[in-house]
Curated annotation (Swiss-Prot):
GO process terms (BP): proton motive force-driven plasma membrane ATP synthesis
Name of the gene this protein is made from: atpB
A matching Pfam family: ATP-synt_A
Name of the protein in question: ATP synthase subunit a
Entry-linked InterPro entries: ATP_syn_F0_a_bact/chloroplast, ATP_synth_F0_asu, ATP_synth_F0_asu_AS, F0_ATP_A_sf
Transmembrane segments: 50-70, 108-128, 161-181, 203-223, 241-261, 262-282
Role this protein plays: Key component of the proton channel; it plays a direct role in the translocation of protons across the membrane.
Membrane topology according to the record: Multi-pass membrane protein
GO cellular component, as recorded: plasma membrane; proton-transporting ATP synthase complex
Amino acid sequence: MAAEEHALTSPEYIKHHLTNMTYGKMPDGTWKLAETAEEAHSMGFTAIHLDSMGWSIGLGVIFCLLFWIVARAANAGVPTKFQSAIEMIIEFVDSSVRDTFHGKSRLIAPLALTIFVWIFLMNLMDLIPVDWIPQVAAFVGANAFGMDPHHVYFKIVPSTDPNITLGMSLSVFVLILFYSIREKGVGGFVGELALNPFNPSNPVAKALLIPVNLILELVTFLARPISLALRLFGNMYAGELIFILIALLPFWIQWALSVPWAIFHILVITLQAFIFMMLTIVYLSMASEKH
C-alpha cells in the first residue's frame, strides 16, 4: 500500500490521504483544483470538496435507486432476501420513530430512514482499502490530465469531511426551528427559551433571570447541530486515520491488524448512523412538544 508511493514520507502520505480534492477561487482570482493543502486553504469560502460532494450525492442516488427498485418489485408473495433486508431496515426505523417521536408528522419516518441509510452508506466507504480508489484517481489524473499524481487528492469517505456532517446537522437544525415555531408559535418558542430552566413565581425574579435563561438555552440549542456534526465527523475521521496508519506498516502486519479493526469498525459505522438518526428524532420530538 504505502510502500508503493516511494516519493512520499509517512507524514506526507498521511497528509495526502486526509486532504480533499478541492476546487475553488485562488487569491489572484483564478479558479482551479488545489495542488496542495495550502492552496486549498487559501481558497477560503469558495473551496468546494469535489470528492465529498460527489460521493455523498452518488451514494444518495444509489440509496434512492435501491429502495425504488425494491418498492417496484414488492409483492405479496415470497420476498427476495434483499427485499427482506430492506423491509427489516424500514421496520426498524419506523419502530424507532414510533417509540421516540410523539408528535404528528408524516415527514419524520422518511427523514429518519434517509438519514440512517445515507450516513451508513457514507460510513461504509471507510471499509474500502485506503489506497485503492485514490491510486486509480492518481493514475487517471496523471495519464488523462497530465497532473502530478502526488497532487491528486481523492477522499472517499464523505462523513470524514466536517463540511458534509455540518451540512447535514444544519439541515436538521432548520427542521428543529420549523417544528418549534409551527407547534408553539414565535412567542411560545421565545418564551420557552426565556423562561427555562429557571422560572420562579416571583415576577421580579422571573424578569431578572430571563437573560440567564436565554444564555443557557441558546447555548444548549445551538450546541445541538454542532455536537451532531462533530460526533459523526470525529468518530469516522479517527477510524479512517487508524486505517491509514495501518497502511504504513509492513504488508504482513497490515492484514493482521486491518481485518480485526475492520470488523470492529462495522459496529462503529452502524452505531454512528443510528446515533445521528436517533438524536434527530429526539430533537424533533422535543421541538414538537407543546408546553
